[in-house]
Amino acid sequence: MAGHSKWSQIKRTKAVVDAKRGAVFTRLGREISVAARAGADPDGNFQLRTAINKAKAAGVPAANIERAIAKGCGAGGDGSQAFEEIRYEGYGPGGVAVLVEVLSDNRNRTAAELRLAFSKNGGNLGESGCVGFLFSHRSEVSLNATSAEGIDEDALLEDLLELEADGYELTEEGALVHGPFTALEILQDGLRQRGWSVQDWGHQWHPLNSIDLHQSDQARQCLQLLEALEALDDVRSVSCNLGEFPELENERS
């Protein structure tokens, strides 16, 4: 649609936002601690192995990684409260569904911060389950194009037929491959082994349908809500079903 944008095309990942705020080490450390509860051996704990690999790619020092693992296993010795994974749901302007995943050591503080962000930006923090059914939880692997010509779609399709992929989308950087929630390790390992440049991988909430906003003021307020949520320290990811909306002046990409 001419003159319109899509949230999926302009959204900034939480990793980019955190890097600008200097909080990426803290966030990745929390993810490692939470994953380590299922076992401190990354060889037998895919979630921990994934968190460690992402931390190393971001330049997190080995000592920080080891401390995060120890804390998750209860061996940190600092007496601090453990972080827990919590999912919050709500609505933004125009009825846009918003799903927020957090890593928090204080539910009351986190809920208060989220409620304030929603209320200040035309939204409402809802009850658990109010919008979750509007999303599917799937595996996603981002690929970087390794040549100026971009992704070789024929080669990618051939490889995806051998893996548990449901499909792919071309992106500015390369391609986004997606598959069932349980197929993340198979997908990212398989793509690496076949020579693809894997940029990122993880589980994401994907909207089953989208809501288009046709009023500029409403769209701007919705984007402000999403950015306010992403800026909170406890927030791990923000997903929504915002579709197309009018081009906005001074829109940041």
Swiss-Prot record:
GO cellular component, one term: cytosol
GO biological process, alphabetically ordered: regulation of DNA-templated transcription
Subcellular location per the Swiss-Prot or TrEMBL entry: Cytoplasm
Alphabetically ordered keywords of this record: Cytoplasm, DNA-binding, Transcription, Transcription regulation
Classification via InterPro entries: Integrase-like_N (IPR017856), TACO1_YebC-like_2nd/3rd_dom (IPR048300), TACO1_YebC_N (IPR049083), Transcrip_reg_TACO1-like (IPR002876), Transcrip_reg_TACO1-like_dom3 (IPR026564), YebC-like (IPR029072)
Xref: Gene3D superfamilies: 1.10.10.200, 3.30.70.980
First-listed, main subcellular location of the protein, grouped into a coarse class: cytoplasm
SUPFAM superfamilies tied to this protein: YebC-like (SSF75625)
One Pfam family it belongs to: TACO1_YebC_N
Cystine pairs: none
Example GO molecular function: DNA binding
Family membership noted in the UniProt record: Belongs to the TACO1 family.
Protein name: Probable transcriptional regulatory protein SynRCC307_1833
Organism: Synechococcus sp. (strain RCC307)
